[in-house]
Amino acid sequence: MTHTHDHEHDHNHEPDYITLVDENGNESLFQILITIDGQEEFGKNYVVLQPTEFEEDEQGLIDVLAYSFTENADGTEGDLQPIPEDAEDEWDMIEEVFNSFMDEQED
Protein backbone atom coordinates (compact mmCIF):
# COMPACT_ATOMS: atom_id res chain seq x y z
CA MET A 1 0.00 0.00 0.00
CA THR A 2 1.33 3.43 -0.93
CA HIS A 3 0.93 6.37 1.45
CA THR A 4 0.42 9.79 -0.05
CA HIS A 5 -0.32 13.00 1.79
CA ASP A 6 -0.36 16.73 1.17
CA HIS A 7 0.64 17.79 4.65
CA GLU A 8 3.79 19.74 5.20
CA HIS A 9 6.00 18.25 7.86
CA ASP A 10 9.51 18.71 9.04
CA HIS A 11 12.04 16.13 7.85
CA ASN A 12 14.68 17.56 10.16
CA HIS A 13 17.57 15.09 10.44
CA GLU A 14 19.24 16.90 13.36
CA PRO A 15 17.31 15.72 16.42
CA ASP A 16 15.46 18.34 18.43
CA TYR A 17 14.49 17.73 22.03
CA ILE A 18 11.84 19.00 24.42
CA THR A 19 11.46 18.55 28.16
CA LEU A 20 7.98 17.76 29.44
CA VAL A 21 7.02 18.25 33.08
CA ASP A 22 4.26 16.08 34.53
CA GLU A 23 1.73 17.04 37.21
CA ASN A 24 4.20 15.95 39.93
CA GLY A 25 6.99 18.17 38.62
CA ASN A 26 8.99 15.27 37.14
CA GLU A 27 10.91 16.19 34.00
CA SER A 28 11.28 13.82 31.04
CA LEU A 29 13.31 14.42 27.89
CA PHE A 30 11.70 13.63 24.53
CA GLN A 31 13.02 13.68 20.98
CA ILE A 32 10.82 15.53 18.50
CA LEU A 33 10.31 12.98 15.72
CA ILE A 34 8.13 15.05 13.42
CA THR A 35 6.09 18.24 13.31
CA ILE A 36 2.97 18.35 11.16
CA ASP A 37 1.32 21.45 9.71
CA GLY A 38 -2.40 20.99 10.20
CA GLN A 39 -3.30 24.68 10.01
CA GLU A 40 -5.36 24.40 6.82
CA GLU A 41 -7.45 21.45 8.00
CA PHE A 42 -7.63 21.87 11.77
CA GLY A 43 -6.22 25.32 12.61
CA LYS A 44 -3.27 23.95 14.58
CA ASN A 45 0.01 22.12 14.25
CA TYR A 46 1.06 18.81 15.72
CA VAL A 47 4.20 17.27 17.14
CA VAL A 48 5.06 13.59 17.66
CA LEU A 49 7.50 12.83 20.47
CA GLN A 50 9.52 9.80 21.53
CA PRO A 51 11.00 9.44 25.03
CA THR A 52 14.80 9.49 24.96
CA GLU A 53 14.78 6.65 27.50
CA PHE A 54 12.49 3.92 26.23
CA GLU A 55 12.07 0.18 26.07
CA GLU A 56 10.67 -1.66 23.08
CA ASP A 57 7.74 -3.97 23.69
CA GLU A 58 7.82 -7.65 22.69
CA GLN A 59 6.96 -6.66 19.09
CA GLY A 60 9.80 -4.13 18.91
CA LEU A 61 7.41 -1.17 19.15
CA ILE A 62 8.00 2.06 21.05
CA ASP A 63 5.31 4.31 22.51
CA VAL A 64 5.21 7.82 21.07
CA LEU A 65 3.17 10.84 22.13
CA ALA A 66 1.31 13.33 19.94
CA TYR A 67 0.24 16.85 20.90
CA SER A 68 -1.24 19.82 19.12
CA PHE A 69 0.09 23.36 19.36
CA THR A 70 -0.73 26.76 17.92
CA GLU A 71 2.08 29.18 17.20
CA ASN A 72 2.18 32.36 19.28
CA ALA A 73 1.72 35.73 17.55
CA ASP A 74 5.51 36.26 17.61
CA GLY A 75 6.06 33.03 15.63
CA THR A 76 7.31 30.98 18.57
CA GLU A 77 5.74 27.65 19.36
CA GLY A 78 2.94 27.80 21.89
CA ASP A 79 1.99 25.38 24.62
CA LEU A 80 1.40 21.72 23.86
CA GLN A 81 -2.22 20.62 24.15
CA PRO A 82 -3.55 17.06 24.35
CA ILE A 83 -5.47 15.90 21.30
CA PRO A 84 -8.98 14.77 22.26
CA GLU A 85 -9.40 11.00 21.96
CA ASP A 86 -12.61 11.49 19.97
CA ALA A 87 -10.92 13.74 17.35
CA GLU A 88 -10.84 10.89 14.85
CA ASP A 89 -10.08 13.03 11.79
CA GLU A 90 -7.08 14.57 13.53
CA TRP A 91 -5.78 11.21 14.74
CA ASP A 92 -6.25 9.69 11.26
CA MET A 93 -4.24 12.51 9.67
CA ILE A 94 -1.48 12.27 12.31
CA GLU A 95 -1.27 8.50 11.89
CA GLU A 96 -1.11 8.74 8.10
CA VAL A 97 1.64 11.37 8.12
CA PHE A 98 3.59 9.61 10.89
CA ASN A 99 3.43 6.24 9.10
CA SER A 100 4.68 7.87 5.88
CA PHE A 101 7.48 9.52 7.85
CA MET A 102 8.48 6.18 9.40
CA ASP A 103 8.38 4.46 5.98
CA GLU A 104 10.76 7.15 4.65
CA GLN A 105 13.09 6.61 7.62
CA GLU A 106 13.32 2.90 6.83
CA ASP A 107 14.37 3.55 3.21
From Swiss-Prot:
Name of the molecule in the record: UPF0473 protein LL0144
Signal peptide annotation: none
Pfam family, one: DUF1292
Family (UniProt): Belongs to the UPF0473 family.
